[in-house]
Regions:
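Mid-domain alpha/beta scaffold segments of enzyme catalytic cores
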Residues: 1-198
């Protein structure tokens, strides 16, 4: 959080999202967030959310949900969007998110089902689409891209992870966004210029 704030202050075109990732809750500092949420360069709270990939016992779930809710409430208080991390936790994520009205933001690196995607879109959320959409076996993500209106899809990286084909296994960078855009255009059977301008 401190590094991203310093980077944003040094560069005019760089803005910051601050927050505590669900796997970094040992360092959770709500006071820090309150002190910096209104900094000129802070535009969102994130990545925040739930991650049950490595540990899905009841204690882990309980430990992650409260900080997630506190960060959402802070975002609402200061009218900031949220960037949500949801890994192997899509139903709990939706249950938390749907308990708040006027919450806006995106689901980073969306990997849930089409049915869940529709529920999040109904709440006004954007769905992050990254390099995974280019993977041969990414049928669920491709189904989401095909069936969700383009205006709800947000092209992104998960740098340095999940580089698109043919760069899979390499360090991911924002220079690969055009590859993701081409795949989205192909799946939706539209021109890439439509993807670029939506």
């Amino acid at each position: 959080n401190i590094e991203v704030l310093e980077l944003a202050k040094k560069h005019d075109m760089v803005y910051a999202a601050i927050g505590f990732h669900p796997t970094d809750l040992d360092s959770f500092d709500f006071t820090f967030l309150e002190e910096h949420i209104n900094d000129d360069k802070v535009v969102a709270l994130g990545e925040i959310g739930l991650d049950y990939h490595y540990d899905n016992d009841i204690d882990t779930k309980k430990r992650q949900i409260d900080p997630f809710k506190k960060q959402i409430e802070l975002a609402l208080k200061y009218n900031k969007p949220v960037i949500i991390h949801s890994r192997d936790s899509i139903m709990d994520t939706y249950n938390v998110v749907s308990s708040y009205s006027n919450l806006r933001g995106s689901l980073h690196c969306y990997s849930g089902s089409l049915e869940m995607a529709k529920l999040f879109v109904e709440k006004g959320f954007l769905l992050g689409v990254g390099g995974v959409v280019t993977f041969k076996n990414a049928k669920i993500v491709k189904d989401v891209v095909k069936n969700i209106d383009l205006k709800y899809l947000l092209l992104e990286t998960d740098s340095p992870y999940l580089a698109p084909e043919p760069h899979r296994g390499e360090v991911n960078t924002s220079t690969y966004i055009p590859i993701i855009a081409e795949m989205v255009a192909s799946i939706k059977e539209i021109d890439i210029s439509d993807v670029a301008t939506t």
